[in-house]
Amino acid sequence: MKYAIIEASGKQFWVEPGRFYDFNSLNVEPGDKIALTRVLLINDNGNITVGKPCLDNVKVEATVLGHLRGQKVTVYKMQPKKKTRKKQGHRTNLTRLLIDNIIN
């Protein structure tokens, strides 16, 4: 099984070819092909290589499937005995990527 651990949009993701993942909003168009170069670890059928912190000459190719919004997060703040209440909500903008290939 081939997989990689990459760093993208401030988080680390375990990615495998043929699967899609949701990243924080990226400034790309749907249908574009992009290369993710911050690869921290790669497993090529049992042969594990770890970077310090990143691997050189290794990249993950992905296709942008589209943009979407995450689930609504509700934030509720209140101060007891003061009648101060504040309710807010937001939805995070996401970009869905299909992992095509891991090139090492």
UniProtKB/Swiss-Prot annotation:
GO terms for molecular function: rRNA binding; structural constituent of ribosome. PROSITE patterns: RIBOSOMAL_L21. It comes from the Eukaryota. The keyword Chloroplast applies. Pfam families: Ribosomal_L21p. The keyword Transmembrane helix does not apply. This protein binds to 23S rRNA. Belongs to the bacterial ribosomal protein bL21 family. Part of the 50S ribosomal subunit. NCBIfam families: L21. This is Large ribosomal subunit protein bL21c. It comes from Guillardia theta. The lineage of its organism: Eukaryota, Cryptophyceae, Pyrenomonadales, Geminigeraceae, Guillardia. The gene is rpl21.
